[in-house]
Curated annotation (Swiss-Prot):
Keywords: Isomerase, tRNA processing. Belongs to the tRNA pseudouridine synthase TruA family. This is tRNA pseudouridine synthase A. PANTHER family: PSEUDOURIDYLATE SYNTHASE, TRNA PSEUDOURIDINE SYNTHASE-LIKE 1. Substrate binds at Y111. One of its GO terms (molecular function) is tRNA pseudouridine(38-40) synthase activity. It catalyses: uridine(38/39/40) in tRNA = pseudouridine(38/39/40) in tRNA. The active site is at D52 (nucleophile). Formation of pseudouridine at positions 38, 39 and 40 in the anticodon stem and loop of transfer RNAs. InterPro entries: PsdUridine_synth_cat_dom_sf, PsdUridine_synth_TruA, PsdUridine_synth_TruA_a/b_dom, PsdUridine_synth_TruA_C, TruA/RsuA/RluB/E/F_N. Disulfide bonds: none annotated. Homodimer. It comes from Ureaplasma parvum serovar 3 (strain ATCC 700970).
Length: 241
C-alpha cells in the first residue's frame, strides 16, 4: 500500500531532511522507525522536498509505499506517534493511490521566513533571525515583488542543477512584533529562499539596489555574491497537491 503522511518538525537538531551517513536527519529517523515497527529493512520514504540543516517545517509531506505495509491509516498514525522523538510531530496519515509521489505530485510549496527586529529573545535563537535595527516593511515588499513570476534563479541558489528556472506564484508579508515573509512557488532550488530573503534585507538596509536585484534576475549567473540568510528563520509552511 501507499501512504501520504504529513508532519512537522523542529529542525534545530537535524542535519536536514535527507538521510546522511553518521548524521541525524528527519528522513533517517523516520525510516528507522518504520524498520523498527514494521520489520521492513528496505523501506524508503519520499519527501516533498529537502530542507537543510536547521530549517523547520510546519507541514512537510512524505509518501511511503511497500507491499508489506497493509494497515489502516490510523494504525500507521498511532505507531508513528508512539515512536517519534519530541522534535517530530505526525499530523495525518492517508491511504493514497499507488501512483502518488510526494515530490512529483506537489503543485506548489510555501515557505515562511521569520525575522525579529523587535527585541532579542535568547530562547528563540533557533527559530527566528534577529536583526538589531528596524526594518522598512515596504522596502522588503518592493524587493520581494521583483521575484514574482517565472525567472532563472541561478543567481539566487547554490544548486548544481542545470535547470534553474522556477515560478514564484505569490509573496506576502505579515507584521506584528515580527516580520514574517511568505513565498509560494512551483518549486525551490537549494538555498533559494534564504538568498531571496538576504537580498530583500540588504535592499531594506540600503546595501543593494532594486536595479541590482533585477539585473541578477535578468542576467542570472552562478556564484553571484548574494548573502545567505540563516537557516533558523526558515520554515517549510505548506505543500499543495
Amino acid at each position: 500500500m501507499n501512504y501520504k503522511i504529513s508532519l512537522r518538525y523542529d529542525g534545530s537538531l537535524f542535519y536536514g531532511w535527507a538521510r546522511q551517513p553518521q548524521k541525524r536527519t528527519v528522513q533517517g529517523d523516520l525510516e528507522e522507525i518504520f524498520k523498527s515497527i514494521f520489520k521492513i529493512n528496505n523501506i524508503r520514504i519520499i519527501g516533498s522536498g529537502r530542507t537543510d540543516k536547521g530549517v523547520h517545517a510546519y507541514e512537510q509531506t512524505f509518501s511511503v509505499k511497500h507491499s508489506a505495509l497493509k494497515y489502516d491509516s490510523h494504525i500507521i498514525y498511532q505507531a508513528l506517534c508512539s515512536r517519534t522523538s519530541s522534535d517530530i510531530q505526525i499530523l495525518e496519515v492517508q491511504k493514497v493511490d499507488d501512483s502518488f509521489h510526494a515530490q512529483y505530485n506537489a503543485t506548489s510549496k510555501t515557505y515562511q521566513y521569520v525575522i525579529n527586529d523587535y527585541e532579542f529573545d535568547l530562547f528563540r535563537n533557533n527559530y527566528e533571525l534577529f536583526v538589531n535595527q528596524k526594518i522598512n516593511d515596504q522596502k522588503i515588499l518592493e524587493a520581494l515583488e521583483l521575484f514574482v513570476g517565472e525567472h532563472d534563479f541561478k543567481s539566487f541558489s547554490t544548486s548544481e542543477l542545470t535547470m534553474t528556472i522556477r515560478r514564484i506564484n505569490w509573496v506576502k508579508i505579515k507584521r506584528d512584533t515580527h516580520l514574517i515573509i511568505y513565498i509560494n512557488a512551483n518549486g525551490f532550488l537549494k538555498n533559494m529562499v534564504r538568498m531571496i530573503v538576504a537580498s530583500c534585507l540588504d535592499y531594506a538596509f540600503n546595501k543593494i539596489s532594486l536595479a541590482k536585484i533585477h539585473e541578477l534576475l535578468i542576467y542570472p549567473k552562478k556564484g553571484a555574491s548574494i548573502k545567505l540568510a540563516p537557516a533558523c528563520g526558515l520554515y517549510l509552511y505548506k505543500v499543495y497537491y
